[in-house]
Design a protein with these regions (language model features):
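Motif- and composition-driven signal specific to adenylation
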Residues: 1-195
Length: 195
């Protein structure tokens, strides 16, 4: 039988600092419930399973690292670590994705933009883009195509345990992709300056 740890979903899981885009970086205290919910509700839609190969692209100081590690380990997927040199956008990243047969990755738009549009990454079946706004041009290149890839625009502040909304991108849609709908078991609220 499993030993009781005394932990509850309300207990602190980790503290991570925000980017400071609204002024000064601050420590976001994240509870177990947030990252567990993210993993529990996203493994299925992202088609993560034993045999999947998740790239650990984000620095440990960035919230996406928690997503990469948690989702890979809780789904039975392999988590692929690499040196910062091998993760450099462009030729090094292409080589890593190809040679390691990466099937799942969360990359910022700037990293995708550095990969030539004619690059074939046949093993990369699920690609999330986050950390900045995704453009229509990136969607046209990376969604579906000959490799039948799902491209998902992920959005959310650090305080939301990595991301709060997702949108599966349609390569035939016009304009930048929306931020999408809330992930399962969550709600979002659109507020004005008065709250």
């Amino acid at each position: 039988t499993a030993k009781e740890t005394g932990l509850t979903p309300d207990h602190l899981a980790y503290v991570i600092y925000t980017s400071g885009s609204t002024g000064k970086p601050k420590g976001a205290m994240l509870e177990h419930r947030g990252i567990v919910n993210l993993a529990a509700t996203q493994i299925g839609p992202l088609k993560l399973k034993p045999g999947s190969r998740m790239l650990q692209f984000a620095s440990i100081s960035f919230d996406a690292c928690a997503w990469e590690c948690t989702l890979a380990l809780t789904s039975g997927a392999a988590l692929h670590l690499a040196s910062r040199v091998d993760l450099m956008p462009g030729a090094p990243l292409i080589k890593l994705l190809t040679e390691q047969k990466i099937s799942h990755a969360l990359l910022p738009p700037i990293a995708l933009a550095a990969i030539p549009t004619d690059t074939r990454l046949k093993h990369l079946k699920t690609l999330l883009v986050g950390g900045d706004a995704c453009s229509e041009a990136l969607v046209k290149v990376w969604a579906d195509g000959p490799d039948k890839r799902q491209l998902i625009n992920a959005y959310g502040p650090t305080e939301a345990s990595v991301y709060a909304t997702t949108h599966r991108c349609d390569p035939h849609a016009h304009g930048n992709p929306p931020i999408g709908r809330p992930i399962a078991n969550t709600r979002i609220y659109i507020l004005d300056a008065q709250g």
